[in-house]
A protein has these predicted regions:
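Enzymes that bind and transform nitrogen-containing heteroaromatic metabolites
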Residues: 2-36, 52-53, 71, 163-165, ...
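Proteins enriched for Cys/Gly/acidic motifs involved in redox and nucleic-acid/cofactor modification
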Residues: 31-35, 61, 124, 135-169
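Zn2+-dependent cytidine deaminase-like catalytic core
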Residues: 42-144, 288-290
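Active-site beta-strand termini and strand-to-loop segments that position acidic
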Residues: 45-46, 158-159, 345-347
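Structural motif corresponding to alpha-helix initiation and N-cap regions
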Residues: 62, 94-95, 121, 143, ...
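Short, well-ordered, mixed-charge alpha-helical segments that flank or form enzyme active sites
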Residues: 90-92, 117-121, 143-147, 172-177, ...
Length: 349
């Protein structure tokens, strides 16, 4: 049964609006939930008014459903729980969300994505057997949830490795530096602001030894005034060259890793159970991940300038002829000041 199978157009409209709200809420959990999924949930009271909203807390904290149900209190009884991921049916550091929904007395549950984790799946069936009206979201909402904040977690569950995004900033002709090596700044402040926001949403930022030596980046997430933000990714340098003790990337918070390998697959394995890895540079590192078939997503920040010469955004991607090109589909585009932002995922067919 899907959400559209219900008889009430007004109810469907409210549920669609609430599920869209839950999807937005789930984004607020990005960067803090690993190894758990970033989930959003909304509770409607029996009259259809919003009674509670929530997103997944850090590991050991409450799941999104529990946050929303706690906020709703007695208003949840006889109401509807809408959630971006099937309620878990697993006792871990926290109890099953299916049991919490039953205890709250909800009459209906609508979820978007089926839980692919065999340890946690089954919440929908448990609720259904207990007499709760359970429905799956419509196909467009399922697709939005799967391509939204859950995409890295789902990829980790299905493939056994982290979701990898290659991010770069370049000119219209694909240059990341001029012939003299100058590169600050190719893109404008709006693009840089966007990048720092993205760093807060992922688990690890990786650069190669060459970029570390050339630019001495800190790889931190910063606000517009340069101050570090509350959410910080793990910072990693990949390559066999030792990272000096005074390198900016080391920082002082202990959130640094040296991945002493040239093999992208081995580097990902060294990172453990992280969900989302952001590969920021340089060209050889990007080429190595592309050649290994390990780039799932590309985020490009393109400045409206042409250099003609200089360093290319990628080198050694393992492509000898046009038919072997790495293909991607545009999922999102935006204008950031004078720049253009593109988010693309790997083409599967």
């Amino acid at each position: 049964m899907t959400m559209s199978d219900g008889p009430d157009d007004g109810r469907r409209r409210r549920e669609r609006e609430s599920l869209a709200d839950a999807l937005t809420l789930s984004r607020s959990a990005l960067g803090i939930t690993t190894p758990n999924p970033p989930v959003g949930a909304v509770v409607l009271d029996p009259a259809g008014a919003v009674a509670g909203r929530g997103a997944t807390e850090a590991p050991g904290g409450r799941h999104a459903e529990v946050v929303a149900l706690d906020a709703a209190g007695d208003l949840a009884r006889g109401g509807t729980l809408l959630v971006t991921l099937e309620p878990c049916d697993h006792q871990g550091r926290t109890g099953p969300c299916s049991a919490r929904a039953l205890a709250a007395g909800v009459a209906r549950v609508v979820y978007a994505v089926r839980d692919p984790n065999p340890l946690a799946a089954g919440g929908a069936e448990t609720l259904r057997r207990a007499g709760v009206d359970v429905a799956r979201a419509d196909d467009d909402e399922v697709a939005a949830a799967e391509q939204g904040p859950l995409r890295a977690w789902l990829h980790r569950q299905r493939s056994g490795r982290p979701y990898v995004t290659w991010k770069y900033a370049a000119t219209l002709d694909g240059r990341v530096a001029a012939a003299d090596g100058s590169s600050r700044w190719i893109t404008g402040p709006e693009s840089r602001h966007h990048v720092h926001g993205r760093r807060q949403e992922i688990d690890v930022v990786v650069v190669g030894s060459g970029t570390r030596a050339a630019d001495d980046p800190s790889l931190t997430a910063r606000s517009d005034d340069g101050a570090p933000t509350d959410r910080q990714p793990l910072r990693a340098v990949m390559g066999l060259t030792p990272v000096p003790p005074d390198a900016a990337v080391r920082g002082s918070d202990g959130r640094f890793r040296h991945l002493a390998t040239r093999d992208p697959a081995e580097a990902l394995a060294m990172l453990g159970d992280v969900q989302h890895v952001l590969v920021e540079g340089g060209p050889r590192l990007a080429g190595a991940f592309l050649a290994a078939g390990l780039v799932d997503e590309v985020e490009a920040y393109l400045a409206p300038i042409v250099l003609g010469d200089g360093r290319s955004a990628v080198q050694g991607a393992g492509v000898g002829t046009l038919t072997d090109a790495h293909g991607f589909e545009v999922r999102e585009n935006a204008t950031l000041g004078r720049d253009v932002y593109l988010r693309m995922t790997r083409r599967t067919a």
